[in-house]
């Protein structure tokens, strides 16, 4: 075994590729879904362009297990996308790289907390 091989095996694996995956998936999902939801619930329904669904219908939709799963995935990916973006804004934009561990822990911790809260809210609905 060469020294470089043993060094490579002894190093800890980074979670960075997984975090970049969540970032890109969250950005893609948010870019595709958020504008449609904003158009529908922010303009089309309030301005009367489309007939607004009643509260009972929306509640029945959200109580469907498949809809709950889709909403949870959307929220989790959007939160991790925002956490990753905010982390790198603080790290590179504001030059706070010396606090990277604290910033990463806080950003991703808030994303996990928000994801858990969303999951709990969807489960108890």
From Swiss-Prot:
Location of the protein in the cell: Cell membrane
Segments passing through the bilayer: 29-49, 64-84, 102-122
Record-level Gene Ontology MF annotations: succinate dehydrogenase activity
UniProt superkingdom: Bacteria
Primary localization: membrane
InterPro entries listed in its UniProt record: Fumarate_red_D, SQR/QFR_C/D
Bilayer topology term: Multi-pass membrane protein
Example GO BP: fumarate metabolic process
UniProt keyword list: Cell membrane, Membrane, Transmembrane, Transmembrane helix
GO cellular-component term (any): plasma membrane
Family designation: Belongs to the FrdD family.
HAMAP family assigned: Fumarate_red_D (MF_00709)
Role summary: Anchors the catalytic components of the fumarate reductase complex to the cell membrane, binds quinones.
UniProt subunit comment: Part of an enzyme complex containing four subunits: a flavoprotein (FrdA), an iron-sulfur protein (FrdB), and two hydrophobic anchor proteins (FrdC and FrdD).
Protein's name according to its UniProt entry: Fumarate reductase subunit D
Name of encoding gene: frdD
